Amino acid sequence: PNMVTSGSTASEQANISLVAEKTVECLQNSLPDDLPAVTFLSGGQSDIDSTAHLDEMNKISSNPWKLSFSYGRALQQAALKSWSGNVENETAAQEVFSHRAKMNKLAALGEWESSLEN
């Protein structure tokens, strides 16, 4: 599923805590506790926002399910931009991809911090 976020054209965007709270609330009201996991799509969110939201969901609640990611664009976008079709940029792009994967792994464990992005 996607996370509960504000519409892309909304003049006011929900903060990280509100997105996490409303997404977890929605899951608690609609999913059985014996479901093993929920994996989220990034749903058009930025790389950092999708990571921050996942991390916050894992921090605010002891959920009966594992909350993780199934991101495509949110994992690949920065790496593709770094690569830009230039073979000379392959190593840098791989490092960018590896970093995003690591950040999302930490978010799935509720261990991500924004300072790790610098």
Residues covered by each model-derived region:
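Active-site capping/gating regions of soluble enzymes
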Residues: 1-118
